[in-house]
Design a protein with these regions (language model features):
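Helix-loop junctions and terminal segments of transmembrane helices
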Residues: 29, 58-74, 144, 255, ...
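N-terminal membrane topogenesis motif
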Residues: 1-26, 77-84, 88, 149, ...
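Signature of the first transmembrane helix
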Residues: 6-64, 94, 98-105, 128, ...
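Interhelical loop/hinge segments that connect adjacent transmembrane helices in multipass membrane
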Residues: 1-3, 7, 177, 193-233, ...
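Alpha-helical transmembrane segments of multi-pass membrane transport and lipid-handling proteins
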Residues: 85-113, 168, 266-269, 290-341, ...
């Protein structure tokens, strides 16, 4: 019982460490949209997409090996040597990547027909990614040592300082997109030094090629699946830059910023449910337990999806510059994909519990191929609508495949019906019914939201008050 309470406590602290920095970055959104143009946002989205992709290439999923084999080390010395050996390899490997990109990157991006200058924007992104690698293994270490509070405080402090520095550079020094990128680079350097310092007593620097080969044999098969997932979710940004323009990319990125707020709902809820799923796996009543978890999870997701979609227009009208007001149109389309990705994450946990990790990778690779092909085919003709719907379609297909593969004996009609209800309400009150008076529009949508979530609670047999009470207790 005590162990269970400790697990819940640690999980909640980890979730806060991820959620609070995301909320802080969102706080800056209303300010930044008044000082940055859609083109500036397009540049930032492109660089962020590139950095996300580079992080997978930079680590080759070796951090997964570290998490799995840390406690299999024979003693504390072996644990310290594992961290030192892996850190030495990762730093040396990434220095080579940085040098190659500095030498050949400009030529490569010309082949992509990118509209973003390699110098200074892409260079800053590459350097930021390099210094960010210094935080990955230490973060994994502190999770293994079950010291969530310390790690969470570091993440929150980084989020606060990043927010302040970004606003100073953009608002007071008028650095526009460069201000955001400079703040990320500066903080990545500062926290690289901090992480090196705090891990000194847990590390013995060394290089053991034999062990590195064992690590790579374990981790490299995981890379295609990880890359495929990010290709599915971020390749649209790269292709929008190629086939459309930076202004469109900025509008799309702004819509995605609001839609991805749903991840805050899903991540917090999932982190609360995940340990219980693994703990209950194999029990006779697992299907019943999972169905109850799924219904609660779907309810939270649909509540967030509907709220973000309904009020997206009013949000941009109140909190963003006029140039970004049209972004609301794409929010509901993108949110479908975010919703499907979150549900997929839940069923992916079941597949992982079955020990079928290759299935997740195979589905992600399939989705990545479909996503790239459809975007290349449809973007030039249908623009941002194609980008939003292709991403959502692919993630929906991946989700359905995982649901089928999980092969759980549970009811599937209720979440489907709930999803269709939310889609219908969203279509009517975002695209069909528009009130010019913003106050009346907000009042109407609050009423619609309240009625709809009441209907969803009946369909899914969920008590929203119990969900809130459960999170408060945790």
């Amino acid at each position: 019982m005590a162990e269970s309470k400790k697990l819940i406590k640690n999980t909640t602290i980890y979730a806060l460490g991820d959620i609070i920095p995301r909320l802080l970055s969102f706080v800056a959104f209303p300010v930044l949209t008044h000082y940055l143009t859609p083109t500036d946002y397009g540049i930032l989205n492109y660089v962020n997409a590139l950095s996300t992709f580079l992080m997978v290439v930079s680590f080759l999923c070796t951090n997964t090996y570290y998490l799995v084999y840390f406690y299999r080390c024979e003693d504390e010395i072996a644990q310290k040597k594992l961290l030192g050996n892996l850190s030495t390899f990762i730093i040396a490997y990434n220095l080579i990547i940085v040098l190659l990109l500095l030498l050949c990157g400009n030529y490569f991006f010309k082949l992509l027909d990118s509209k973003i200058s390699f110098y200074p924007y892409i260079i800053i992104g590459i350097l930021t990614n390099f210094f960010n690698i210094f935080s990955i293994l230490p973060s994994a270490l502190y999770r293994l040592l079950e010291k969530p509070l310390f790690l969470t405080m570091i993440n929150i402090s980084r989020g606060v300082i990043t927010l302040v520095l970004t606003l100073i550079l953009v608002v007071f020094f008028n650095y526009s997109a460069l201000g955001v990128l400079y703040s990320l680079l500066i903080l990545s350097i500062v926290y690289a030094i901090i992480f090196l310092f705090i891990t000194q007593k847990f590390i013995i620097w060394n290089f053991n090629w034999k062990q590195i080969k064992e690590i790579l044999i374990f981790s490299l098969p995981l890379v295609p699946g990880s890359l495929a997932y990010y290709i599915t979710t971020i390749s649209d940004r790269i292709l929008i830059d190629k086939y459309l323009n930076l202004n469109d990319l900025g509008i799309y990125g702004t819509a995605s910023t609001l839609a991805l707020i749903l991840n805050i709902f899903s991540y917090g809820a999932y982190k609360a449910f995940e340990p219980f799923i693994f703990k209950s796996w194999g029990e006779e009543n697992f299907s019943y337990i999972f169905e109850k978890i799924r219904n609660n999870f779907v309810y939270v997701l649909l509540f967030g999806s509907l709220g973000l979609s309904l009020f997206s227009k009013e949000f941009f009208q109140i909190f963003s510059g006029v140039k970004f007001h049209g972004a609301y149109f794409y929010v509901p389309m993108i949110i479908i994909g975010v919703y499907c990705s979150s549900v997929k994450m839940l069923y992916g946990t079941v597949v992982t519990a079955k020990g079928k990790t290759k299935v997740n990778s195979g589905i992600s690779i399939f989705g990545a191929i479909i996503s790239v092909v459809l975007n290349i085919s449809l973007l030039p003709s249908f623009g941002l609508v194609a980008a939003a719907l292709v991403s959502s379609l692919v993630l929906a297909i991946e989700c359905l495949i995982l649901i089928w593969y999980a092969k759980l004996d549970i009811h599937r009609n209720t979440p489907i019906l709930s999803f269709l209800v939310v889609c219908l309400v969203t279509f009517l009150f975002v695209y069909m019914i528009n009130l010019e008076n913003i106050f009346l529009s907000i009042v109407l949508k609050i009423t619609v939201l309240t009625v709809t979530i009441s209907i969803l609670s009946k369909i899914l047999s969920v008590n929203p008050f119990e969900i809130v009470k459960g999170f408060i207790k945790k």
